[in-house]
């Protein structure tokens, strides 16, 4: 998949519109490339592609199939592109890949404060809050027994004492990333918290 993403990064503008007009990439394709780039482990490309998708927005924020200022314009209110872009934005915060739940993995470093509650594809809802560039609260919510799970976060997002409340089976630090393997949790345990 990495070669496909790299090829599209290099050549997408040549054939990336919905129709053979214009000079940019259609927002649906751009959002799809954001997700694909994230799945390959790219850190910055997902946001670049989300920004590209956003370039097609009109005066009211509506997405177009093609909306190039001073150039080609086709079909406003392209809702599948808008939904695909929303999905790509969600995956900046919570993305399941390679048997892991990646938490805030693609959030830009300049975003120093954020919070979210989003479902993961693994059946767990992830709730997190960051302040001053550090995650200060992380909750996993499930309606059934779940786990064990591997969570991957950028190490710089973790504060001291961040992991004390989970049943941590293992912790590995690799290339600026921290991987936590968390033991099984039951619905009866409710919410498990990580606090800084």
Positions of predicted regions on the chain:
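Active-site core of glycosidic bond-cleaving carbohydrate-active enzymes
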Residues: 1-100, 136
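Catalytic cores of secreted or luminal carbohydrate-active enzymes
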Residues: 76-127, 131
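Repetitive beta-strand solenoid architecture
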Residues: 97, 157, 162, 174-176
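Surface-exposed beta-strand/loop patches in extracellular or lumenal glycoproteins
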Residues: 103-105, 140-157
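Residues that act as N-cap/strand-start positions at coil-to-secondary-structure junctions
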Residues: 110-112, 122, 134, 145, ...
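Carbohydrate-binding surface patches
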Residues: 122-149
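Solvent-exposed beta-hairpin/edge-strand motifs
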Residues: 151-169
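C-terminal beta-strand-rich structural cap/linker in extracellular carbohydrate-active enzymes
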Residues: 167-196
């Amino acid at each position: 998949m990495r070669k496909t993403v790299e090829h599209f990064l290099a050549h997408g503008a040549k054939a990336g519109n919905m129709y053979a007009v214009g000079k940019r990439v259609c927002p649906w394709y751009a959002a799809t490339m954001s997700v694909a780039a994230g799945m390959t482990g790219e850190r910055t490309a997902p946001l670049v592609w989300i920004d590209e998708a956003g370039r097609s927005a009109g005066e009211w924020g509506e997405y177009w199939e093609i909306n190039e200022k001073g150039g080609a314009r086709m079909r406003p209110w392209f809702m599948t592109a808008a939904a695909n872009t929303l999905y790509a934005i969600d995956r900046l915060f919570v993305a399941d890949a390679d048997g892991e739940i990646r938490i805030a993995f693609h959030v830009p470093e300049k975003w120093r404060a954020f919070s979210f509650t989003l479902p993961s594809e693994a059946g767990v809802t992830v709730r997190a809050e960051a302040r001053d560039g550090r995650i200060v609260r992380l909750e996993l919510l499930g309606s059934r027994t779940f786990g064990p799970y591997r969570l991957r976060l950028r190490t710089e997002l973790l504060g001291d004492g961040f992991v004390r409340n989970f049943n941590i089976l293992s912790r590995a630090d690799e290339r600026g990333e921290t991987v936590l393997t968390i033991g099984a949790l039951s619905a009866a345990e409710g919410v498990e918290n990580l606090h800084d």
